[in-house]
Amino acid sequence: ENGLGELAYEAMNKRDYPSFGHWIDQGATTTWEQWNGENSRNHPMFGGSLTWFYRKLAGLNADPLQPGYRHIVFRPQPVSQIDWAKYATATPYGQASVDWSKRGGRFTMTVEVPVGCTATVCVPDAKAPSAVRTDGTGKKDGNIVYNGMKDDYAEYTVRSGKYTFTVE
């Protein structure tokens, strides 16, 4: 939320004690109650930070003003060390998904919005709306509306369908 994706990546990939990486090196397959492994070894105590992977890195969230995924917000926060992220979740209306990658100076993001839902799609590193190319099932029907630039993100509103956004 504060634009500290690089720091979050470093914290999630740390291998020395105390860290999630240290737990993995100790054979953990769940989050533990304490960093040192005492007490429960299947405990949600530190699990909240794991939401960074889908909420921030992949960037798929229910709009807090329209709960239940009636309106979805796609706003990935890529970090320099990761070239792609993919996430899907079941909603009351069907599957919502995001799949982004960056290769050779090109950023591509495909989003899927369930039937009967709308979404705000924020395309990172766009710098200008002319840098973004869109394609998808709803484009011909005028289902993509450009809302403007916000913090180096080109923001769009889309209706249900599958859309691909590319930044060259």
Residues covered by each model-derived region:
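Non-catalytic C-terminal accessory modules of carbohydrate-active enzymes
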Residues: E1, E6-E168
